[in-house]
Amino acid sequence: MSQIDQLLLSIASNKLAYYALLFSLLFGVFKLTTFTLRFASLIVDLFILPAVDFSKYGANRGNWAVVTGASDGIGKEYALQLAKRGLSIVLVSRTQSKLELLATEISSKYKVNTKIVAFDASKDDEENYLELEKAIYDLPITVLINNVGQSHSIPVPFLETEQKELRDIITINNTATLRITQVVAPAIVATVEKSQKKVRGLILTMGSFGGLLPTPYLATYSGSKAFLQAWSAALAGELNPKGVDVELVISYLVTSAMSKIRRSSLTIPNPKQFVASTLASVGRRNGAQERFATNTPYWAHAIMHFAIENTVGVYSKIANTLNFNMHKSIRTRALKKQEKRSRLAAEKIE
């Protein structure tokens, strides 16, 4: 009798060992099956399904979208691409002059209406929200893009984070996002109800890999984005019965002023590419296969997200250590650049 036969005979004679082996085999089959289904869903979402038709969100029917952080980068692209789809745009951002230029560009290119609201999200000022409320009064709004956000100027230990930077990040990323949503969402619900649910509403909020993965040296920013994950999922549960889809959009690096990256690459899209992938796949999960009301839309980011979730895990010590080492290195290089600039400036004065 071979050793394998002896092992099988031993297991068969021991009920506990038999059931343990059976359970292990069934569990293994279950895990393999669920992984295969998630991977298949990832491929279908990313590469097979057609782009979402925005007529379901009221495009080309005289409806409006509100876009925050609209003057530059990703926010500007959201405004342009939503206007191209036939939505009039309320542009919300800090710099009036930039908003005016963008409003002119949108109106001339896409023949839709625009409104502008100069809004400093770093100041939790009641006047800001009253002005926004006045601007959208009686408008048939179907879409809100919560794009306004701020990160650290450079990676920094939490205990060394300046109080102003800490307050600004929380105020902009969290307080302003929630309060703007409280102002705009009732208008979206009213528009959906008025249409007798012939159109749906949509609220997209920008998340980040920094919130997906706890990120040392960006602790405040990381926490602020993780908060938006839980908030968006909870809000999705509340508003879905009212005909409003709520989704957190997760991105890795995108070329922008905030990321300080200028050149796009295979894994780093420009704002136009990123927003196009987002609007084309609203309602799908792409890389966020295990998360409710969450989408990682850009294909390279989606594959990275899926790989991390299904290997080491986002909350693992391995992921945390890799993040720690990466951002510590970025901080070291940034401090050297600051030191060099300061030295050159001092030499010029002399």
Swiss-Prot record:
Residues annotated to bind NADP(+): 66, 120, 147, 221, 225, 254, 256
Coiled coil: none
EC assignment: 1.1.1.330
GO BP terms: fatty acid elongation; sphingolipid biosynthetic process; very long-chain fatty acid biosynthetic process
Source organism, top-level taxon: Eukaryota
Active site: 221, 225
Annotated Gene Ontology cellular component terms: endoplasmic reticulum membrane
Pathway listed: Lipid metabolism; fatty acid biosynthesis
Topology class, membrane: Single-pass membrane protein
UniProt-listed PROSITE patterns: ADH_SHORT
Main enzyme class: oxidoreductase
Molecular function, one GO term: ketoreductase activity
Catalytic activity: a very-long-chain (3R)-3-hydroxyacyl-CoA + NADP(+) = a very-long-chain 3-oxoacyl-CoA + NADPH + H(+)
Regions that span the bilayer: 20-40
Primary location class: endoplasmic reticulum
Family: Belongs to the short-chain dehydrogenases/reductases (SDR) family.
Purpose of the protein: Component of the microsomal membrane bound fatty acid elongation system, which produces the 26-carbon very long-chain fatty acids (VLCFA) from palmitate. Catalyzes the reduction of the 3-ketoacyl-CoA intermediate that is formed in each cycle of fatty acid elongation. VLCFAs serve as precursors for ceramide and sphingolipids.
Name of the protein in question: Very-long-chain 3-oxoacyl-CoA reductase
